[in-house]
Amino acid sequence: MLNNLTPSQQQYDRQVAYWLLLCAVVIFGMILLGGVTRLTDSGLSMVDWKPIKGIIPPITQADWQAMFAKYQQFPEYQKTNFTMTLEEFKPIFMYEYLHRMLGRFIGIIFVLPFLFFYFTKRIAHGLTPRLVVMLLLGGSQGLLGWYMVKSGLVDNPHVSQYRLTAHLGLAVFIYGFIVWTVLDLLAPKLSHPKH
């Protein structure tokens, strides 16, 4: 027989906190992968931004050739990597591809549980606006990432250090914002005795 008692808001807060903690861990991994992408000069290997259609990576040799041909039309290849072979291109492409896919994954693990918690009324009063701000910041981060990459697809094959700093800074801010919210949800609520 099912227990008809609903969990207390404290249990709901804990569920929301664990979900946000998962998001924070994945975002931390994203920041690390972004660093690897930067250090391996992989960020400009994907020269277009297709948030929906760009999910499937090159699979066949013809797919890889087409992707490499696109890359060859841009300054990074023409001025810096003009001796690069297709086999050398594949790893740098995959770093950037994984970075973008992890961004999509973060969006999914944020949005779907958010909708579940929202429609099942498990989000504490007053927390929804904070979660909506997190969602908007996450979307802005994706746009800022593309804005940063675009800066390196012009004559100078290097991303703008200002846009890079903004992209990293926003990632760290989002991470901190989520961790702060997790701690806020998990911290015992202090009750002040009445005098």
Residue ranges and their predicted role:
Residues 106-112, 169-185:
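Hydrophobic cores of alpha-helical transmembrane segments in multi-pass inner/ER membrane proteins
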Residues 37-46, 143-164, 168:
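Interfacial helix-loop-helix junctions of multi-pass membrane proteins
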Residues 69-108:
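Individual transmembrane alpha-helix segments
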Residues 120-128, 190-195:
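Membrane-interface helix-boundary motifs at transmembrane edges
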Residues 1-12, 187-195:
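Membrane-interfacial, low-structure loops and terminal tails that flank and connect transmembrane helices
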Residues 16-56:
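N-terminal signal-anchor transmembrane alpha helix
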Residues 18, 125-138:
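Membrane-interfacial loop-to-transmembrane alpha-helix junctions, especially the N-terminal start
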